[in-house]
Amino acid sequence: MGVTVENISAGDGKTFPQPGDNVTIHYVGTLLDGSKFDSSRDRGTPFVCRIGQGQVIRGWDEGVPQLSVGQKANLICTPDYAYGARGFPPVIPPNSTLKFEVELLKVN
């Protein structure tokens, strides 16, 4: 259980976010059956959040710091690292494993 990071393309290999950093990310979130439930790319605006502070799901708080700037990866988050038994009705069913294709654009 947890988060698995599957590399798609390398980043700079030296600029990694630390807890409390603001990160700018593009992402596409899907269920394991491939159904898309959210996408910053579709909105045309990257997502900005503070990492490691509980502002996002645990899978992101633990997975994003493993990425360096410019890296693209899949974060596979088990339910306990995503939305758990509640899910996020109506788009994410209870106990769903989620896949996020994430690109770390910037760390401040």
Curated annotation (Swiss-Prot):
EC number of this enzyme: 5.2.1.8
Description of how activity is regulated: Inhibited by both FK506 and rapamycin.
InterPro entries registered for this protein in UniProt: FKBP-type_PPIase (IPR050689), PPIase_dom_sf (IPR046357), PPIase_FKBP_dom (IPR001179)
Membrane-spanning parts: none
Enzyme class, first EC level, given as a word: isomerase
Keywords assigned: Cytoplasm, Isomerase, Rotamase
This protein's record includes keyword Isomerase: yes
Annotated GO MF terms: peptidyl-prolyl cis-trans isomerase activity
Superkingdom, natural source: Eukaryota
Cysteines engaged in disulfide bonds, as pairs: none
Pfam families: FKBP_C
Domain called PPIase FKBP-type: residue spans: 20-108
Protein location: Cytoplasm
GO cellular component: cytoplasm
Reactions catalysed, as given in the entry: [protein]-peptidylproline (omega=180) = [protein]-peptidylproline (omega=0)
Function: PPIases accelerate the folding of proteins. It catalyzes the cis-trans isomerization of proline imidic peptide bonds in oligopeptides.
Family: Belongs to the FKBP-type PPIase family. FKBP1 subfamily.
Name used for this protein in its record: FK506-binding protein 1
